[in-house]
Structure formats: C-alpha cells, structure tokens
C-alpha cells in the first residue's frame, strides 16, 4: 500500500471491550487490492475484518449510507461475516448517525439498521435468504471424530444440519453444558472436513431453555481456534431452529457465546412470521484505532 488507511477496531455483540468479538473496520478501502486487505486482516489477527468501498450501481439505499463490504480472515476472503457487519454498522452509526444502511456483500445484499438504545448503539442485520441441508453420515462421523465428540453426547432433539444465512455452518447440539464446555479438537482434521464441505464454522449449541442457547464456533478455516461471537452462524441457527420446528415462526432467541473463552457476548436472533430472512442484532464498542500500510 502506498497510502495509510485507518484501521478501526471494534468489538461486536458486547458493550464491554473485554467481551464480544473484535473486528477490524476500514471505512475507506478504496485503492486497496485483495493482497492489501488480506495483509491488514492478518496483521490484526482477528477472525475477520471488514473493508468498505463505493456501492455498486443500483444497490439502492440512501446516498452516503450504502456500501460494498468485503470480509477477510487472516487466511482468506469470506463471503459474509456477521460480527464484522455489526462492528462496521456501529462505526458508521457513530459517524453518520442512526438509521438504515445497505451493504453489498459477496453473499448478497444485507440491510442493516442502527438504533440508539439506552445511550448505546445497536445494529440489526437482516440476512440473505437462508436454508438448511442434511449432512451425510460419513461427513458427520468425521466431524465428530475431529471434535472428539462421541455421537451419544449429541442432543437428539436438535439433529445435525448444515445451515446457511450468508455462509455455511454445521450445527451440532450438545446434550449438556458440560459437553459444550469441553472443547479440545484436532485443528487440522476439522479444518480438512470443513474445507471439503465449504463450511465457515461449526456451530456447537446447547439449549438452556425454550429461547436461550449457549453456542461455540470453532473456526480453523479462518486460522482461528474459536470465534467469540458469530453473527452469520447466529442467523443460520435461527433459520435452522425454525425449519426443524424447534421454535415458532415468530420468535426472539438469545444466544450466549464467548463465555468459555472469557469474552462473553450476547446475540439476539429475531424471526418474523411471513419473512424467511433472519435478523441478528447486538451492541458494540470501539477498541481504538491503528494504522496499516506505509
């Protein structure tokens, strides 16, 4: 890079800098190539960072509130990232005010609304059209072996499925909170399974009550052992929960993530009757700027 681009750092899905999932945000990535953006993401070391540029023609949205957004992990570009979307929306909300935003992502168009809530900003993203699919028994067995999870440790009420709401995630439900807490997996073996199935994370879930869940997301394909708060997976899980009849057509779910990592986060998932898309919301806070490039 020949010019300096300010790299903002925000944590998403928590108002506490020590909680949630940190993301890099570059509000003006014009002039940056793919290698530049990957280098910034790798230098930061966060699970993903977001890079904004001018919107494509015909995207819609209010002038100055529509953008092209690309997401990079330390290892590769990803089609969509929920927590970096929330972080970006909070950063924009602080600069251009609350209201509606429109993001053009590789996964599709993602509307985001930023609102004020008790003095804090809250961002709500609406996913692209979600869907779920079965996973082959052999692929499931390989994923469980990589996790060192015996099949009897799964919750039979929540069957394994691959869920998509911008990125693909394998949903596996633990029968107990203890099972969820005990996570020591084979990084390379799980990464190989995930690459073969084109998965972004494996979403490990434990159901505390009707609408409250605890989740963990291994992310070896991004070069990260575990993601502290995964908005894209939360959206995919909302679609999964509705499709298998776990929750009604209209529901609000609370997902607790990051607790076992010491970075607690809260993700709110909203399902609306008559709308197959999923809304994922959370707060965020700035961690401080740094510079990238020379």
What is the meaning of each model-derived region?
Residues 1-80, 86-294:
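Active-site proximal loop and beta-alpha junction motif in alpha/beta enzyme cores
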